[in-house]
Regions:
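Bacterial N-terminal signal peptides
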Residues: 11-19
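Bacterial N-terminal signal peptides that target proteins for export
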Residues: 1-11
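Serine/proline-rich low-complexity intrinsically disordered segments, especially terminal tails, linkers
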Residues: 4-5, 17, 181
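Contiguous interface-forming segments/domains that mediate binding rather than catalysis
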Residues: 24-201
């Protein structure tokens, strides 16, 4: 391994920490976060085809408390989205997923966790699909029960059925829930394809 590689990894990690600290430190930075429609923020947009999953501008204080904003900021939605996706992409680049394999060593799913609420926003970043399509193929299924937890499955021959209750539990116990809706991510973009909520079908 090149002696420069460890330094590069440390540099990237420190950059991510600094960006997250800037976002979470004073509670003044605008972030575009995913959440559930039950949150009822003053300004929101639904993900494509979603009934329960929204994007909303927010600030996050030092302790991680979310405060929805009444407007996306001076630059509008585009500036807020560009800045948030840049931070989310850097967070994604420094987050190692837990890769789950079956008894034959076949990769079944990936689970992403992080302290930052921007983790869920990372599914909208340009780097998310290339990173996981290299593992699961060109079409992915995503479950986002919380802002700091994302499940990634291949679209076909996946373990989603066996994980339904675990994902529901994650949603119910999380202090930062998103929704139980399921999403397909492909070169065509992100779209809602179903739900794990038995009462919302």
């Amino acid at each position: 391994m090149s002696p420069g590689i460890p330094f590069l990894r440390v540099f990237i990690a420190l950059s991510a920490i600094l960006l997250c600290t800037r976002a979470l430190g004073a509670g003044e930075s605008g972030l575009l976060l995913l959440g559930g429609s039950s949150l009822r923020p003053p300004v929101k947009r639904y993900l494509p085809g979603a009934r329960r999953t929204i994007l909303f501008p927010s600030s996050v204080d030092f302790y991680g408390l979310i405060s929805p904003l009444s407007r996306p900021g001076k630059g509008g939605w585009k500036t807020l989205a560009d800045d948030s996706l840049e931070r989310a992409a850097l967070l994604l680049a420094t987050t190692d997923p837990c890769l789950i394999r079956d008894s034959h060593g076949v990769l079944e799913m990936a689970v992403l966790t992080a302290d930052s609420p921007l983790l869920a926003t990372a599914v909208l970043s340009k780097g998310f699909l290339p990173r996981f399509s290299a593992l699961f193929g060109p079409e992915l299924l995503l479950a986002i029960p919380a802002r700091n937890k994302v499940y990634v499955f291949p679209k076909l021959a996946n373990r989603l059925s066996a994980m339904k209750q675990t994902i529901r539990d994650d949603f119910l116990i999380s202090p930062a829930p998103v929704s139980l809706e399921l999403f397909e991510l492909s070169a065509k973009g992100l779209r809602t394809v179903g739900t794990l909520d038995p009462d919302d079908r």
